[in-house]
Regions:
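Flexible "cap/lid" loop of the alpha/beta hydrolase fold
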Residues: 130, 139-178
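Acidic catalytic loop of the alpha/beta-hydrolase fold
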Residues: 234-237, 260-264
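Conserved acidic catalytic loop of the alpha/beta-hydrolase fold
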Residues: 96-113
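Conserved HGGG/HGGXW glycine-rich cap/lid loop of the alpha/beta-hydrolase fold
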Residues: 29-86, 293
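Alpha/beta-hydrolase fold catalytic core
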Residues: 1-48, 69-73, 106-111, 304, ...
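Conserved alpha/beta-hydrolase catalytic His-Asp/Glu region
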Residues: 175-245
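Catalytic histidine-centered segment of alpha/beta-hydrolase-like enzymes
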Residues: 263, 284-300
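Short beta-strand/loop motif that positions the catalytic acidic residue
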Residues: 249, 255-257
Length: 331
Protein backbone atom coordinates (compact mmCIF):
# COMPACT_ATOMS: atom_id res chain seq x y z
CA UNK A 1 0.00 0.00 0.00
CA UNK A 2 1.19 3.49 -0.76
CA UNK A 3 -0.18 6.63 0.83
CA UNK A 4 0.35 10.20 -0.26
CA UNK A 5 -1.42 13.46 0.46
CA UNK A 6 -3.08 15.49 -2.29
CA UNK A 7 -2.83 19.25 -2.60
CA UNK A 8 -5.75 21.48 -3.49
CA UNK A 9 -6.68 22.00 -7.11
CA UNK A 10 -7.60 25.35 -8.58
CA UNK A 11 -10.96 25.64 -10.34
CA UNK A 12 -10.88 26.93 -13.91
CA UNK A 13 -11.73 30.55 -14.60
CA UNK A 14 -14.51 29.69 -17.05
CA UNK A 15 -16.25 26.35 -17.56
CA UNK A 16 -16.39 24.74 -20.96
CA UNK A 17 -19.78 24.18 -22.63
CA UNK A 18 -21.50 20.84 -22.23
CA UNK A 19 -20.79 18.41 -25.05
CA UNK A 20 -23.29 18.01 -27.89
CA UNK A 21 -25.41 14.89 -28.07
CA UNK A 22 -27.90 12.87 -30.03
CA UNK A 23 -30.67 10.33 -29.51
CA UNK A 24 -29.54 6.72 -29.94
CA UNK A 25 -31.88 3.76 -30.35
CA UNK A 26 -31.22 0.87 -27.94
CA UNK A 27 -33.78 -1.81 -28.64
CA UNK A 28 -37.29 -0.67 -27.81
CA UNK A 29 -36.27 2.73 -26.43
CA UNK A 30 -33.88 5.63 -26.96
CA UNK A 31 -31.24 7.33 -24.86
CA UNK A 32 -29.51 10.66 -25.24
CA UNK A 33 -25.74 10.32 -25.65
CA UNK A 34 -23.15 13.11 -25.50
CA UNK A 35 -19.79 12.75 -27.24
CA UNK A 36 -16.55 14.66 -26.70
CA UNK A 37 -14.67 14.64 -30.00
CA UNK A 38 -11.07 15.74 -30.29
CA UNK A 39 -9.37 16.20 -33.67
CA UNK A 40 -6.13 15.01 -32.10
CA UNK A 41 -7.63 11.74 -30.86
CA UNK A 42 -6.50 8.80 -33.03
CA UNK A 43 -9.18 7.19 -35.17
CA UNK A 44 -8.49 3.92 -33.38
CA UNK A 45 -8.93 5.44 -29.91
CA UNK A 46 -10.56 3.06 -27.45
CA UNK A 47 -14.13 3.96 -26.40
CA UNK A 48 -15.12 5.13 -22.93
CA UNK A 49 -18.69 5.33 -21.63
CA UNK A 50 -19.73 7.36 -18.58
CA UNK A 51 -22.84 6.59 -16.48
CA UNK A 52 -24.23 9.27 -14.14
CA UNK A 53 -25.79 9.02 -10.69
CA UNK A 54 -29.27 9.48 -9.23
CA UNK A 55 -30.97 12.65 -10.53
CA UNK A 56 -27.83 13.35 -12.55
CA UNK A 57 -27.23 13.41 -16.29
CA UNK A 58 -24.55 13.21 -18.94
CA UNK A 59 -23.76 16.85 -18.10
CA UNK A 60 -22.04 15.57 -14.95
CA UNK A 61 -19.15 14.29 -17.07
CA UNK A 62 -18.32 17.41 -19.11
CA UNK A 63 -15.00 18.30 -17.46
CA UNK A 64 -13.69 14.75 -17.09
CA UNK A 65 -14.53 14.00 -20.73
CA UNK A 66 -12.56 17.08 -21.73
CA UNK A 67 -9.47 15.55 -20.14
CA UNK A 68 -10.01 11.97 -21.30
CA UNK A 69 -10.85 12.80 -24.91
CA UNK A 70 -7.20 13.28 -25.87
CA UNK A 71 -6.72 9.52 -25.60
CA UNK A 72 -10.21 7.99 -25.49
CA UNK A 73 -13.37 8.29 -27.59
CA UNK A 74 -15.63 9.49 -24.78
CA UNK A 75 -19.41 9.18 -24.58
CA UNK A 76 -21.80 9.81 -21.70
CA UNK A 77 -25.43 8.74 -21.70
CA UNK A 78 -28.53 9.95 -19.93
CA UNK A 79 -30.08 6.93 -18.23
CA UNK A 80 -33.75 6.33 -19.11
CA UNK A 81 -35.96 8.98 -17.51
CA UNK A 82 -33.04 11.30 -16.73
CA UNK A 83 -31.48 14.20 -18.60
CA UNK A 84 -32.81 14.21 -22.15
CA UNK A 85 -33.62 10.49 -22.28
CA UNK A 86 -37.27 9.40 -22.23
CA UNK A 87 -38.23 6.58 -19.85
CA UNK A 88 -38.14 2.93 -20.83
CA UNK A 89 -41.47 1.77 -22.31
CA UNK A 90 -41.81 -0.79 -19.49
CA UNK A 91 -41.26 1.90 -16.84
CA UNK A 92 -38.58 -0.17 -15.10
CA UNK A 93 -35.79 1.53 -13.16
CA UNK A 94 -34.19 -1.46 -11.45
CA UNK A 95 -30.41 -1.76 -11.52
CA UNK A 96 -30.78 -4.75 -13.84
CA UNK A 97 -33.05 -2.82 -16.23
CA UNK A 98 -30.70 0.17 -16.34
CA UNK A 99 -27.80 -2.21 -16.90
CA UNK A 100 -29.68 -3.70 -19.86
CA UNK A 101 -29.87 -0.24 -21.41
CA UNK A 102 -26.13 0.31 -20.95
CA UNK A 103 -25.37 -3.14 -22.37
CA UNK A 104 -27.51 -2.42 -25.44
CA UNK A 105 -25.64 0.84 -26.01
CA UNK A 106 -22.24 -0.84 -25.72
CA UNK A 107 -23.30 -3.65 -28.05
CA UNK A 108 -24.35 -1.05 -30.59
CA UNK A 109 -20.77 0.25 -30.65
CA UNK A 110 -19.46 -3.28 -31.29
CA UNK A 111 -16.35 -2.64 -29.21
CA UNK A 112 -15.66 -3.20 -25.51
CA UNK A 113 -15.47 0.02 -23.51
CA UNK A 114 -13.76 1.61 -20.56
CA UNK A 115 -16.85 1.92 -18.34
CA UNK A 116 -17.00 4.74 -15.78
CA UNK A 117 -19.89 5.10 -13.31
CA UNK A 118 -20.75 7.44 -10.44
CA UNK A 119 -23.08 6.64 -7.52
CA UNK A 120 -26.19 4.95 -9.02
CA UNK A 121 -24.22 4.77 -12.27
CA UNK A 122 -21.52 2.93 -10.35
CA UNK A 123 -24.00 0.27 -9.24
CA UNK A 124 -25.27 -0.04 -12.82
CA UNK A 125 -21.74 -0.22 -14.23
CA UNK A 126 -20.78 -2.91 -11.72
CA UNK A 127 -23.77 -4.99 -12.81
CA UNK A 128 -22.73 -4.64 -16.46
CA UNK A 129 -19.11 -5.60 -15.75
CA UNK A 130 -20.12 -8.61 -13.66
CA UNK A 131 -22.67 -10.01 -16.10
CA UNK A 132 -21.09 -9.12 -19.46
CA UNK A 133 -17.32 -9.11 -18.90
CA UNK A 134 -16.58 -9.35 -22.63
CA UNK A 135 -17.97 -5.82 -23.09
CA UNK A 136 -15.61 -4.19 -20.59
CA UNK A 137 -11.96 -3.21 -21.04
CA UNK A 138 -11.71 -1.50 -17.67
CA UNK A 139 -14.08 -0.42 -14.90
CA UNK A 140 -13.93 2.82 -12.93
CA UNK A 141 -16.39 3.33 -10.06
CA UNK A 142 -16.68 6.75 -8.41
CA UNK A 143 -18.46 6.70 -5.02
CA UNK A 144 -20.47 3.65 -6.13
CA UNK A 145 -23.85 3.19 -4.44
CA UNK A 146 -23.24 -0.22 -2.89
CA UNK A 147 -24.47 -1.73 0.40
CA UNK A 148 -22.61 -0.06 3.26
CA UNK A 149 -22.03 -1.14 6.84
CA UNK A 150 -21.84 2.54 7.78
CA UNK A 151 -24.49 4.26 5.59
CA UNK A 152 -24.55 8.04 5.67
CA UNK A 153 -27.77 9.56 7.03
CA UNK A 154 -28.78 11.23 3.76
CA UNK A 155 -28.47 7.93 1.91
CA UNK A 156 -30.55 6.14 4.57
CA UNK A 157 -33.36 8.69 4.31
CA UNK A 158 -33.41 9.03 0.55
CA UNK A 159 -34.98 5.62 -0.29
CA UNK A 160 -38.15 6.85 1.49
CA UNK A 161 -38.77 8.78 -1.74
CA UNK A 162 -39.26 5.42 -3.43
CA UNK A 163 -42.19 4.38 -1.23
CA UNK A 164 -45.60 4.22 -2.97
CA UNK A 165 -47.88 7.15 -2.10
CA UNK A 166 -45.24 8.58 0.27
CA UNK A 167 -42.69 9.34 -2.46
CA UNK A 168 -44.88 11.47 -4.74
CA UNK A 169 -46.11 13.51 -1.79
CA UNK A 170 -42.60 14.15 -0.53
CA UNK A 171 -41.45 15.23 -3.99
CA UNK A 172 -44.39 17.63 -4.40
CA UNK A 173 -43.77 19.08 -0.94
CA UNK A 174 -40.08 19.51 -1.68
CA UNK A 175 -40.76 21.24 -4.99
CA UNK A 176 -43.34 23.54 -3.41
CA UNK A 177 -41.18 24.43 -0.42
CA UNK A 178 -37.96 25.18 -2.28
CA UNK A 179 -37.57 27.12 -5.53
CA UNK A 180 -35.26 25.58 -8.16
CA UNK A 181 -32.40 27.93 -7.23
CA UNK A 182 -32.34 26.64 -3.67
CA UNK A 183 -32.68 23.03 -4.75
CA UNK A 184 -29.72 23.29 -7.11
CA UNK A 185 -27.69 24.95 -4.35
CA UNK A 186 -28.69 22.19 -1.92
CA UNK A 187 -27.55 19.46 -4.32
CA UNK A 188 -24.21 21.19 -4.82
CA UNK A 189 -23.76 21.59 -1.05
CA UNK A 190 -24.52 17.90 -0.54
CA UNK A 191 -22.40 16.50 -3.37
CA UNK A 192 -19.36 18.79 -3.21
CA UNK A 193 -16.83 18.86 -0.40
CA UNK A 194 -16.15 22.49 -1.31
CA UNK A 195 -19.21 24.03 -3.02
CA UNK A 196 -17.02 26.98 -3.98
CA UNK A 197 -15.41 24.75 -6.62
CA UNK A 198 -18.70 24.52 -8.51
CA UNK A 199 -18.50 26.74 -11.64
CA UNK A 200 -20.98 29.52 -10.95
CA UNK A 201 -21.29 30.19 -14.67
CA UNK A 202 -23.18 26.88 -14.90
CA UNK A 203 -25.60 27.62 -12.07
CA UNK A 204 -28.29 29.39 -14.12
CA UNK A 205 -28.26 26.62 -16.72
CA UNK A 206 -28.76 24.00 -14.01
CA UNK A 207 -31.70 25.97 -12.59
CA UNK A 208 -33.26 26.11 -16.06
CA UNK A 209 -32.70 22.38 -16.49
CA UNK A 210 -34.39 21.67 -13.14
CA UNK A 211 -37.37 23.80 -14.16
CA UNK A 212 -37.62 21.75 -17.34
CA UNK A 213 -37.41 18.50 -15.41
CA UNK A 214 -40.17 19.63 -13.04
CA UNK A 215 -42.49 19.98 -16.04
CA UNK A 216 -41.94 16.39 -17.25
CA UNK A 217 -44.63 13.90 -16.27
CA UNK A 218 -42.17 11.04 -15.91
CA UNK A 219 -39.40 12.84 -13.97
CA UNK A 220 -40.83 12.06 -10.52
CA UNK A 221 -41.40 8.42 -11.50
CA UNK A 222 -37.78 8.15 -12.64
CA UNK A 223 -36.56 9.52 -9.31
CA UNK A 224 -38.88 7.30 -7.27
CA UNK A 225 -38.16 4.19 -9.32
CA UNK A 226 -34.39 4.64 -9.14
CA UNK A 227 -34.50 5.36 -5.40
CA UNK A 228 -36.59 2.23 -4.89
CA UNK A 229 -34.12 0.24 -6.98
CA UNK A 230 -31.17 1.41 -4.89
CA UNK A 231 -33.03 0.56 -1.70
CA UNK A 232 -33.78 -2.94 -3.02
CA UNK A 233 -30.16 -3.38 -4.09
CA UNK A 234 -28.95 -2.52 -0.60
CA UNK A 235 -31.11 -5.32 0.83
CA UNK A 236 -29.82 -8.06 -1.46
CA UNK A 237 -27.95 -10.74 0.45
CA UNK A 238 -25.80 -13.74 -0.31
CA UNK A 239 -25.06 -14.56 -3.92
CA UNK A 240 -27.38 -11.76 -5.08
CA UNK A 241 -25.48 -9.05 -3.21
CA UNK A 242 -23.81 -6.35 -5.32
CA UNK A 243 -20.60 -7.14 -3.47
CA UNK A 244 -20.75 -10.64 -4.97
CA UNK A 245 -20.92 -8.90 -8.35
CA UNK A 246 -17.71 -7.10 -7.37
CA UNK A 247 -16.01 -10.45 -6.83
CA UNK A 248 -17.05 -11.51 -10.35
CA UNK A 249 -15.44 -8.56 -12.13
CA UNK A 250 -12.40 -9.60 -14.16
CA UNK A 251 -11.58 -6.28 -15.84
CA UNK A 252 -8.90 -3.98 -14.38
CA UNK A 253 -10.78 -1.87 -11.85
CA UNK A 254 -10.41 1.53 -10.22
CA UNK A 255 -12.64 2.46 -7.28
CA UNK A 256 -12.59 6.10 -6.16
CA UNK A 257 -14.05 7.42 -2.90
CA UNK A 258 -14.25 10.98 -1.64
CA UNK A 259 -12.84 11.58 1.82
CA UNK A 260 -15.65 14.08 2.54
CA UNK A 261 -18.47 12.27 0.76
CA UNK A 262 -21.76 12.94 2.56
CA UNK A 263 -23.60 10.11 0.80
CA UNK A 264 -21.17 7.19 0.44
CA UNK A 265 -18.89 6.53 3.40
CA UNK A 266 -15.23 6.35 2.26
CA UNK A 267 -14.69 3.59 4.82
CA UNK A 268 -16.33 1.36 2.21
CA UNK A 269 -12.92 1.43 0.52
CA UNK A 270 -11.85 -1.30 2.92
CA UNK A 271 -14.63 -3.61 1.83
CA UNK A 272 -13.97 -2.80 -1.82
CA UNK A 273 -10.34 -3.80 -1.35
CA UNK A 274 -11.50 -7.12 0.09
CA UNK A 275 -14.14 -7.93 -2.55
CA UNK A 276 -12.62 -6.97 -5.91
CA UNK A 277 -10.17 -9.44 -7.43
CA UNK A 278 -7.82 -6.87 -8.89
CA UNK A 279 -8.39 -3.22 -8.18
CA UNK A 280 -6.80 0.10 -7.40
CA UNK A 281 -8.68 1.68 -4.48
CA UNK A 282 -8.35 5.44 -4.12
CA UNK A 283 -9.59 7.89 -1.48
CA UNK A 284 -9.33 11.48 -2.67
CA UNK A 285 -8.79 14.01 0.13
CA UNK A 286 -11.04 17.09 0.25
CA UNK A 287 -13.46 15.50 -2.19
CA UNK A 288 -17.20 14.84 -2.05
CA UNK A 289 -19.64 12.55 -3.84
CA UNK A 290 -18.99 13.65 -7.44
CA UNK A 291 -15.22 13.50 -7.80
CA UNK A 292 -15.48 13.65 -11.59
CA UNK A 293 -17.03 17.13 -11.24
CA UNK A 294 -15.17 18.46 -8.19
CA UNK A 295 -11.71 17.01 -8.95
CA UNK A 296 -11.73 15.95 -12.62
CA UNK A 297 -7.97 16.34 -12.91
CA UNK A 298 -7.32 13.85 -10.11
CA UNK A 299 -9.86 11.39 -11.48
CA UNK A 300 -8.32 11.62 -14.95
CA UNK A 301 -4.88 11.06 -13.46
CA UNK A 302 -6.03 7.92 -11.67
CA UNK A 303 -7.70 6.59 -14.82
CA UNK A 304 -4.44 7.23 -16.68
CA UNK A 305 -2.61 5.11 -14.12
CA UNK A 306 -5.21 2.34 -14.41
CA UNK A 307 -4.95 2.25 -18.19
CA UNK A 308 -1.17 2.62 -18.25
CA UNK A 309 -1.35 5.55 -20.65
CA UNK A 310 2.12 7.11 -21.06
CA UNK A 311 2.00 10.70 -19.89
CA UNK A 312 -1.52 10.30 -18.54
CA UNK A 313 -4.05 12.76 -19.91
CA UNK A 314 -1.85 15.81 -20.38
CA UNK A 315 0.50 17.87 -18.24
CA UNK A 316 -2.00 18.76 -15.51
CA UNK A 317 -3.14 15.23 -14.82
CA UNK A 318 0.42 13.90 -15.03
CA UNK A 319 1.38 16.26 -12.22
CA UNK A 320 -1.59 15.07 -10.14
CA UNK A 321 -1.02 11.35 -10.68
CA UNK A 322 -0.52 9.36 -7.47
CA UNK A 323 -1.48 12.21 -5.14
CA UNK A 324 -4.36 10.39 -3.45
CA UNK A 325 -4.39 7.79 -0.69
CA UNK A 326 -4.25 4.54 -2.63
CA UNK A 327 -3.99 0.82 -2.25
CA UNK A 328 -3.76 -1.86 -4.89
CA UNK A 329 -5.25 -5.29 -4.31
CA UNK A 330 -4.95 -8.57 -6.15
CA UNK A 331 -6.58 -11.78 -4.98
Amino acid sequence: MTQETARETTPGSAPIPHWPGRMVSVGDHEVFVRSAPDPKTPDHAEPALCVHGLEGSSRNWTDLMDLLRTQLACDALDLPGFGDSPPRPDGRYSIAALAQTVIALIEKRQNPVHLIGNSLGGAVSLKVAATRPELIQSLTLISPALPDLHPRLDLVRFPVVGLPRVGPRLIRQYQAALPPERRVAAVIATCYSNPGLYPQARFAAEVAELNRRDSLEYAAAALMGSARALSAEFLRKGRHSPWRDAARVVAPTLVIYGQRDRLVDPRAAGRAAHMFREARIVVLPRTGHVAQMERPDLVAAEIGILLGIPGGFGRLTQERAGEADTQSVQH
